[in-house]
Each structure stands twice: as C-alpha cells, then as structure tokens.
Amino acid sequence: MEESAQKTWSVAEPQKLTFEEPVAEVRVRMVGGTVNVVAADEGPARLEVAEVDGPPLYVVQEGGILTVSYEDLPWNGSQGFKEWFEGKPWKAWSSSGTGRKAWERSATVTLTVPAATRVQLATVGATAFVSGIGGATDIHGVSGDATLVGLSGKVKAKTVSGSVEAQSVTGELGFHTVSGGLTVVDGAGGNVRADSVSGDMLIDLALEDRAGQSPVNISLTSVSGQVAIRLPHPADARVEASTATGGVSNAFDDLRVSGQLGAKRITGTLGAGTGTLRATTVSGSIALLRRPAAQAAPLALDKKVL
C-alpha cells in the first residue's frame, strides 16, 4: 500500500486546518501555552491555532501521523525532546537570530481527532487537556498541568513538577513525577500505578460495576507526599499500606491498623480480596476512605490524620 506524501504547514498566526487524510496518531510538542486534544464522533481531524507567540508552529502530516511542534524542535522521541535542553546553556540560547530566548514562546492549539487516535504530548510550561480519547495516551511534561477526561485507552504520564488530574478514566493509568500531584476522580479503570518524590496523590475510585473485568490493582509510592484513597463499598482487595513516620487514617472495619510510634501499617482484606491495593510513603500520611453510595463529595486530603 502506497504511503501518503508528506504535507507541511507553517503556522505563525491564528489559523484553522482540516486534514482530509486519516489520522491515527498525533504528536504534539509545546513550550508554553495550551494544547487541547478532543475526540470527535465523526469527520476529519482538525487543528485550530488560536494564538502563536514566538516562532511559528511546524505542522506535518505523513503516514497517518500528525505532528504539531516547532521546526527547531523536531519530533524524535522523548530522548530527542530531552536533548533539546541539554548540551547547551539553553536559557541563554537565542533562536532564529532574533534575540528571543528559545523558551520564550507559546501557542494555544486545539486538535479534534477520531476517538481511537493515539496521543503523544511533550510539554514545557504548557497546560494540556485531553478528552474522550480511546487510543493510548502518553504525556511527558517538565512543568505545566494536565487534565484527562473520559479516556479509555492506556495512559502514561511523566512529569517533573506538573500535576495530573484524571476524571472518569477507564483505561490503565501510570504516573511518575518528582513534585507534581496526581488526582483521580471517579476512576473506573481499576489499574493505577503511581510514584512520586514529594507530590500528593488523591485517588477516588468508582468501581461498583466491574463484573467480568480484571481485578483492581492499585500501587502508589511516595517519599514525602500524602496519599489518600477513597474506595467504594463493598470493596474487593487485599490491602497493604504503610508509612515510616507519617500518620494513618482508616475507614474500614475489616482492616487492621498497627504501629503507634514511627512506622504504621494498614493491612487486611476487603471483600473476597481478588484485587490488590498497595500504598507506601516515608514521611507522608496515608488515608483510606469509604466512598459514599450516593454521589460523592470532592476528595480532599485531611492533614489531621493520626
């Protein structure tokens, strides 16, 4: 099958583009600004650029892959993005001979794509919003927060200081950060793996209707961040949660809290114990909360845990 020819656009001002050829994957690299990726029920992929400050965006469509980036920041995998900042004093580096620093740029873009599209985002100081995507979503961010709504594909997010909020995500969720936080609201995927150094984790699980699905697998690790997990009742998991010097709070009678001074643990089995819930932190607190049967109130960390 003959591959489609490469098509390119240089976008220096607000503009709308429609891509008649099929798009199976989008790759976006942004330095400052906002990037929105939204699933569409029908129609071709579309790009709306609302604002460009700095060098023009470089848009490429080839072989089902749509790339939105900059000409001096080509897509070359996550390693290529890292190399753009390393090996040079980039804060003093001027692009295009204009005297403008390479990082002094921003753009506001919205991509509307088929729901099955795979999404790869790499950002520095840019805010990301992804909604309704069923393909795999991969986010790499130095700073800047990301909001994920209604994703059903596998999600991987890696940040330095940016936080991630996931709402009604049903796919597997993996998160790695240094100081960014993770908030999961109405999480129905049942598979969450996250680790942080100092970022807090707030996990609200809506897992009441999981008949015939794989067991719940929650694994959270932090050094100094707080961890709060709200589980539906009845829950179904083996629980192992521990903190070396932080406090603990437990809302389940079937779980046992051990330890008085120093290390504390929450252990036991909820329901048949077919799933697993593991949470570990060194100096942060851990709270296991019961999710009300009715519409739940927003989850918040209680800094007064024992």
Summary of predicted features, one role per range:
Residues 1-159, 163-306:
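Intrinsically disordered, low-complexity terminal regions
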